[in-house]
Regions:
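Conserved recognition-core residues within compact binding domains
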Residues: 1-111, 118-175, 179, 183
Length: 186
């Protein structure tokens, strides 16, 4: 199991608060480290969906309702909640954006990356704001690890953080081989 780098605390100040993202309102209902985070998303035109993200990062959808154009939907294992507004245009939000904003706060970069490469793992410690270039670079790095037989999801976050750091990529063989070998031997 992954190590927790920070102590999670309940955030009662978030409960009842909301923010707008891509014309979708996200309202937090409960934030508790033992039970996860619960929130609902609404498009302002009658479409709403309840979401719970458990401490292990998995999600459950509940309470989907909607008007003619407002009904939200999620694509199977997709982490994207999609809404149609009154004009029939798609609007949506990624679940990991709502989770990161709840536990850490607003992010200043355009993307949120899943450090271990598993897009359904929405634990806040697995999420990190990145630029588009960083996001693409990290995806290539994780593909390379998998090709060598190393599962990034099994690496502790401290090893993964070092491996994904931009300075490690200048010469990844010499920088990271020691840590990866130690982890794989244990």
């Amino acid at each position: 199991m992954h190590q927790r780098r920070f102590e999670l605390i309940r955030k009662p100040e978030l409960e009842g608060s909301s923010f707008l993202f891509n014309d979708v309102e996200v309202r937090y209902v409960a934030t508790c480290p033992e039970t996860g985070i619960s929130f609902y998303c609404s498009n302002g035109h009658g479409g709403a969906i309840g979401v719970r993200v458990y401490p292990n990062g998995r999600k459950a959808l509940a309470g989907i309702c909607g008007a003619k154009y407002g009904k939200p939907y999620a694509h199977g294992k997709s982490e994207y909640l999609n809404f149609k507004n009154a004009f029939g245009h798609n609007k949506g939000i990624f679940i990991h954006h709502a989770v990161y904003t709840a536990w850490v706060g607003p992010f200043d970069k355009p993307y949120i990356d899943h450090k271990n490469g598993i897009t359904t793992d929405n634990r806040w410690e697995n999420l990190e704001p990145v630029t588009g270039t960083e996001n693409s670079r990290r995806a290539g790095i994780l593909r390379g690890l998998r090709a060598t037989g190393i599962n990034p999801a099994e690496l502790p976050f401290d090893v993964l953080d070092k491996y994904l750091a931009p300075e490690a990529q200048k010469d990844p063989k010499t920088v990271m081989d020691h840590d990866l070998k130690n982890h794989c031997e244990n």
